[in-house]
Amino acid sequence: MKKTKLLNASLSHYIATLGHTDSLVICDAGLPISNQVERVDLALEAGVPGFLQTVDVVISEMFVEHAVVAKEIREKNPQIHDALLDSLRKLSEQQGNCIAVEYVEHEEFKVLSSESKAAVRTGEFSPYANIILYSGVPF
């Protein structure tokens, strides 16, 4: 049995197969996921698992180079936004790199998400709780 945080086999597989600049989406329960993107559906019920909890587990195993979020999160979901930025700041310190965060309109976010290797659907029921994480290399 694995001894790291991430126990979900499918999600662990997708993270392990990411190459430089490949992306992974972590999204709330309502984001439309393209049929061309592999889906890892973790949602059990409203709020379970939560978006931030899922992000923290994923970034414990993924080297992140940069991230994309919808502009709307700043106004419509400031608590999630601030906690997300805090998690990314801590990850930057751990990894020894600067993780750039790009803000785009939600409609553009949906287009970009359709280019990801996989999308992780959480049980999050708050608006714009979505992020695209782009894989970097730890060297």
UniProtKB/Swiss-Prot annotation:
Domain of life: Bacteria
EC number: 5.4.99.62
Main EC class the enzyme belongs to: isomerase
Subcellular localization(s) per the UniProt record: Cytoplasm
Active site (catalytic residues): 20
Pathway(s) where this gene product acts: Carbohydrate metabolism; D-ribose degradation; D-ribose 5-phosphate from beta-D-ribopyranose: step 1/2
Alphabetized UniProt keyword annotations: Carbohydrate metabolism, Cytoplasm, Isomerase
GO MF term (any one): monosaccharide binding
Catalytic activity: beta-D-ribopyranose = beta-D-ribofuranose
Binding site for substrate: 28, 106, 128-130
GO CC aspect terms: cytosol
GO BP of this protein: D-ribose catabolic process
Family annotation (NCBIfam families): PRK11797.1
Free-text function comment from the UniProt entry: Catalyzes the interconversion of beta-pyran and beta-furan forms of D-ribose.
Quaternary assembly: Homodecamer.
Family (UniProt): Belongs to the RbsD / FucU family. RbsD subfamily.
Matching HAMAP family: D_rib_pyranase
Name by which UniProt lists this protein: D-ribose pyranase
Source taxonomy: Bacteria, Pseudomonadati, Pseudomonadota, Gammaproteobacteria, Pasteurellales
